């Protein structure tokens, strides 16, 4: 691969990162719009809270450590978010009868509406993504998959130890 091609790939990668940041800012606004159309009155004020609701909805019963692990968040951050979600009545906390130390979370009816709306939006985006992938051949899809797997491994390694590594092969 030529240096020019590598530079073009890198430039597009950086552009993709910037677009992803911008998209994150518009996702909440889109969620608010969809919620209004579905007559969902109360909504958490940030996407992380919505994603915590989604995580709880997908994995009930789940505790603080489970949410932190699945979402790659600190336990302290999950505690802060879950406390707010309990106060806003999107989730409830409870203890299992055989384990009084662990606190688990489940969705309230209000939280379930947020979860269902979030799932609906994700399904719509997933379908659009699959349709986009259909424009590539099987071989091209395999190359994209390999690239994304290796890039993800590299980024996860950097996040774990804080040092940029060479891409994992």
Curated annotation (Swiss-Prot):
Residues 64-87 bind DNA. One of its GO terms (molecular function) is DNA binding. It holds the Pfam family MarR. PANTHER family: HTH-TYPE TRANSCRIPTIONAL REGULATOR PCHR. Disruption phenotype: Deletion of the gene induces changes of proteins involved in cellular processes depending on iron availability. In iron-rich medium, mutants overproduce a red pigment after entry into the stationary growth phase. Residues 10-153 form the HTH marR-type domain. It comes from Bacillus subtilis (strain 168). InterPro entries: HTH_MarR-typ, Metal_resp_HTH_trans_reg, Tscrpt_reg_MarR-type_CS, WH-like_DNA-bd_sf, WH_DNA-bd_sf. Induction: Up-regulated in response to iron starvation. Negatively autoregulated. Also repressed by CcpA in stationary growth phase. Homodimer. Keywords: Activator, DNA-binding, Repressor, Transcription, Transcription regulation. PROSITE patterns: HTH_MARR_1, HTH_MARR_2. Represses the expression of the yvmC-cypX operon, which is involved in pulcherriminic acid biosynthesis. Also negatively regulates yvmA, yvnB and its own expression. Positively regulates yisI expression. Acts by binding specifically to a 14-bp palindromic motif, the YvmB box, which is present in the promoter region of the target genes. This is HTH-type transcriptional regulator PchR. GO terms for biological process: negative regulation of DNA-templated transcription; positive regulation of DNA-templated transcription.
């Amino acid at each position: 691969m030529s240096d020019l091609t590598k530079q073009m790939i890198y430039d597009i990668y950086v552009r993709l990162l910037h677009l992803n940041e911008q998209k994150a800012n518009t996702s909440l606004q889109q969620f608010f719009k969809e919620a209004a159309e579905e007559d969902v009155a109360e909504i958490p004020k940030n996407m992380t809270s919505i994603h915590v609701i989604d995580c709880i909805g997908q994995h009930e019963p789940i505790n603080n450590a489970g949410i932190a692990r699945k979402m790659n968040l600190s336990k302290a951050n999950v505690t802060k978010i879950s406390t707010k979600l309990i106060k806003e009545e999107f989730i409830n906390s409870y203890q299992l009868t055989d384990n009084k130390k662990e606190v688990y979370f489940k969705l309230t009816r209000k939280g379930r509406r947020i979860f269902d709306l979030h799932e609906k939006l994700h399904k719509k985006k997933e379908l659009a993504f699959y349709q986009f992938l259909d424009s590539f051949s099987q071989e091209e899809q395999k190359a994209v998959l390999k690239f994304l797997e290796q890039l993800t491994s590299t980024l996860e390694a950097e996040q774990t130890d804080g040092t940029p590594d060479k891409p994992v092969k």
